[in-house]
Each structure stands twice: as C-alpha cells, then as structure tokens.
From Swiss-Prot:
GO molecular-function terms, A-Z: DNA binding
GO biological-process terms attached to the record: DNA repair; DNA replication checkpoint signaling; meiotic cell cycle; replication fork arrest; replication fork processing
A Pfam family recorded for this sequence: Swi3
Localization (cell): Nucleus
Name of the molecule in the record: Chromosome segregation in meiosis protein 3
UniProt keyword terms in alphabetical order: Cell cycle, DNA damage, DNA repair, DNA replication inhibitor, Meiosis, Nucleus
Region called Disordered, residue ranges: 1-47, 172-229
Family statement drawn from the similarity comment of this UniProt entry: Belongs to the CSM3 family.
Gene source species: Phaeosphaeria nodorum (strain SN15 / ATCC MYA-4574 / FGSC 10173) (Glume blotch fungus)
Source taxon at top rank: Eukaryota
Name of the gene: CSM3
C-alpha cells in the first residue's frame, strides 16, 4: 500500500498539472506548440500573402496615352474637315475697308477650332506643330485634293457652253427646214393654183381672134411736118445693118 501512495500525486501537484505547471516550469506553451498541426507551421509563411495583411500593397498607376497632334488627328472629323465646314458656313469677308475685322474674325475662328481639337497646346504652339505635320507626304496629297476640289471645273463649263450652242443652233436649222418646206409648198400651191393647159389654149385662141378682127392702123404722118424725131436715126441704123 505504501508504494501506491508514494506514486499518487498530491492535491497541489494535481492543481499544478491542471494549471500547466510541471516541476516549476510552464508547459502550456510547449504543449500547444507540440500539438499544433504540421500544415499550420508549413503554411505560416504564405498566410500573410493570402490575407494581404502583413505584406505591403504596391499600387501601379496606368499611364494614360497623351494625345498627339499628328496627321491622323488633323484628318479626323474634328480636324480639317470640320474647319472647312465652319469656314464655309460662318466666315464671311466684308471686303475692302474691313481688312482688319476680316483677319480678326478668321484668327478667332482658327483659335476656337484648335482649342477644341487640341486643348493641351497654346494657339501659337499648335500652329507650329501643324506646320511641321503639313510637310508630310500624306498631308501634301490631301492638300492637293482639297485645292483641286475648290477649283472650278473647266470641262463642265465647256460642256454647258456647247450644250447652249446646240440648243441655240437647233431652232435655226429647224426654221431653215421649215422655210424651205414652205417655199416648196408655195411653189406647189402656185402650180396647182395656175390655170390648166386647156384654159391657156382657150385664152390664146381668144386673143388671136381679137387681134385678127381688130383693124390694122398704121402711123400716119401729118402734113404739118410733125415727124417722129427718131425716124431718121432708125433708118440710119437699118442701113448700117444692111451693110454688115
């Protein structure tokens, strides 16, 4: 019985064991570490990465591309095409005596257009950039096309003039043909309106009968010497004819 009593712990030892104290040392921490699962110790290094608590967050800003005043922007709809539209609709020059006002309105229109197209640059700087871009091959080709569009079309003008001449000449030819037809119709009408051959023969016969029935009268010289003044000349001409 004695050995069993010696192995049995006392009440104080039981209290120490329950409180995690063995032989004056705290064993609660060592037991907790020994009982901790192995996977917890292995994944302790990546736990902060998954939760994002202990690791520093690095924020990277995305760079917004800066718009450039290049040929693509100038040839887009807000570019030179819009400038051409507003210049036709809004810009009106007053002419002689108003040169200063006309230039001021034109510069104001250019300034407003460039401010909408490329607000990052000042007016003078934007003009310098546009001048450099204008030397590119693409801009030179487009400028040539715009100049050709503004020129009057000579071929169309000549075609219109030719059409007018044809229209003017057409009535004259028609009138000439109508006049010729009228002359021919008039001649035909005159021929138709003329007397027939039988009627002409009858008229000629009547005139011949009248001539035969009429008495022949010869010119009689008056005794008073009233001769024809041309009688002597006529006789001389007759004598000359006989000589030949």
């Amino acid at each position: 019985m004695a050995p069993s009593r010696a192995n049995t712990p006392s009440d104080d030892e039981l209290d120490n064991i329950l409180n995690g104290i063995t032989e004056g040392r705290d064993i609660s921490g060592t037991q907790a570490e020994s009982t901790r699962p192995a996977y917890a110790s292995k994944g302790s290094g990546n736990a902060g990465d998954g939760l994002g608590i202990d690791e520093e967050i690095i924020i990277t800003k995305k760079r917004i591309p800066i718009p450039k005043l290049d040929d693509n922007r100038l040839l887009s709809d807000p570019g030179i095409p819009r400038l051409r539209r507003i210049s036709k609709d809004r810009l009106r020059f007053k002419g002689k005596g108003h040169e200063y006002g006309d230039i001021a309105r034109m510069l104001n229109m250019y300034q407003l257009w460039l401010d909408d197209l490329y607000p990052r640059a000042k007016f003078a700087d934007a003009l310098t950039i546009i001048e450099k871009v204008g030397h590119t091959k693409r801009m030179q080709m487009m400028r040539k096309e715009w100049i050709d569009e503004g020129k009057p079309r000579r071929t169309s003008a000549y075609e219109e003039e030719d059409a007018d001449e044809v229209v003017v000449q057409a009535p004259t030819t028609e009138q000439a043909t109508e006049s010729m037809e009228g002359v021919e119709q008039g001649e035909e009408g005159a021929e138709r309106a003329g007397p027939d051959e039988d009627e002409l023969d009858a008229l000629l016969a009547e005139s011949a009968q009248q001539n035969t029935s009429a008495p022949k009268t010869l010119p009689v010289r008056t005794a008073g010497g009233e001769d024809d003044p041309f009688a002597d000349e006529m006789e001389a001409m007759v004598d000359m004819e006989d000589m030949w």
